[in-house]
Structures are given as structure tokens and as C-alpha cells.
Amino acid sequence: MTLQRLRCATWNVHRAKGTDGLVDPERVVQAIDHSLAPLGLDVLALQEADAECRPHAGILDVGDIASRSGLEYVHDMSLRWGPESDGFLGTILFLSPTLRRTHADVIDLPGHCHRGAVSLEVRCGSGLVRIISTHLSLSQPLRIVQMRTIGQYLRRRPAMQTILLGDLNEWRPWGGAMFRPRLLGTRLRGPVLRSFPSTRPLLPLDRILTDAPGVVLGMRAIDTVEVARASDHLPVVADITVP
């Protein structure tokens, strides 16, 4: 069987607040245009891309991002927190037009700070792939509960290769209890790469993971000056083999 590859990127844009303390949404869009779009992405996941407080209004020009990247903004109202939001609690996904969406959900995650995930099932060539983007809690016990919630969702959905990407806030290189297969019902794997803080990366908070038969290849952090100024996280990019 010939395997295809999906090029995926994830970036916590810190609500457009740069390392200089300035809030500049256009700077984030420019960084995506100059540092991510040329990579030929199939999937772009953003976190902290809506305002933190209700009504979680959109911060970025998602139409401009779609135009510059060649990707499609996928969030109809069913995938947004509210009419003023661009995503679901700050999580936004853009997909290549070659990926046809077959099912989509938002997943409410427990915790004292409202968190969520966006799940898309897409047709890629002759097969189906599930893409989940999320931003997990800073608290390890809450991350475990949140991953269990995602696992309960997966058990209700048809079996298919799953890609999980986003700011998982897991700083331990060896992983942790949140990655145990019994929580998710599957074993997610991927490289560990330091991505935070952007000015001197020390912690591997941002992850791109997949389960069998997929493999995460060529993972790297994008550390251009423009990107490092735009957010306190670096974006990470990887290729994932899919059927």
C-alpha cells in the first residue's frame, strides 16, 4: 500500500500578543504568510486565536489567512463558540481543499478554564483520517481528565487513523499519564520538540501525534525572527503518513 503524507502545522498564537508585549493580529497573519504558507501545508491548527473572555470574539483575519495560505477555513457555526468567534474557544483549523470533510464535532473539555477541541473526519485519497486540534490545561490532573474525555469521544466514533495536534501543555519529554493508551483507547506517538518560550525554547508544549498506521516524520520548529516576535510559542510542523 502506498502511503501519502499530510503536512501539518500547529501554533499557539497567544491571542496575537507578541514577545514585545504588543497585541498585533496583523503580525501573526504576516508570520503565517511568510513562514508557514510557503511550506505547502495541508493542515494548519491555531490555538488562542479568539479572545479569552466571552463572547470569545475572533482576533485574526481568518479570510486573509485562508487566502495567503491556500487553505480553507472550515468553521461554520457548528464549529464556533458563538457568532462573534472564529473558532471553538480559540482553536481554529484550516484544511487543504483536497481534503473533503465527512464529519465534524466540537468537544467540551472539563476544567476551571473552559477548554475544547475541534475534531474533523476527512477523506484523504482512498481513506479516512481524523484530525483533532486542542489546547489542554496547565494542570496535569486536568490534562488527564481532558484526554480521557477525548478518548471517550473516540470510542463513540468509527475507527480510523487519528492525528492530534495543538498546545498540549505537557512539558515532560517522556510524556506522562495523559498519553496512556487506556485513556484514549489508542496509542498516539510523535517526536518531542522544544517550542516554548519562542525566544529561547525549553519546553515541548506543542505536539503533533498520530496513531498506527501513521508515522510523524520530519518534525521541526519554525524559528524565524518574525514568528518569534509574534507569539510566545513557536509553530511546529511535521509530515504524517496516512493511507
Question: What role is predicted for each listed range?
Answer:
Residues L99, D105-L109, E121-R123, Q140, ...:
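Metal-dependent phosphoester-hydrolase catalytic domains
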Residues R7-V13, I32-A57, R130-T134, Q146, ...:
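Active-site beta-strand/loop signature of hydrolases that rely on acidic residues for catalysis
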Residues D20-V28, A57, H112, L142-T149, ...:
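Soluble or luminal CAZymes and related metallo-dependent hydrolases
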Residues A16-G18, A51-A57, G82-P83, S139-L142, ...:
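Active-site environment of divalent metal-dependent phosphoester hydrolases
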Residues Q4, F88-G90, G116-V118, G127, ...:
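Residues that flank catalytic or metal-binding motifs in active/ligand-binding sites
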Residues L71-D108:
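Catalytic-core segment of enzymes that process non-peptidic bonds
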Residues M1-A9, L95-R101, C113-S133, I240-P243:
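Beta-strand-turn-beta hairpins that frame and shape the catalytic cleft
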Residues M1-R68, H75, R80-S85, V227, ...:
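N-terminal, active-site-proximal structural segment of metallo-dependent hydrolase catalytic domains
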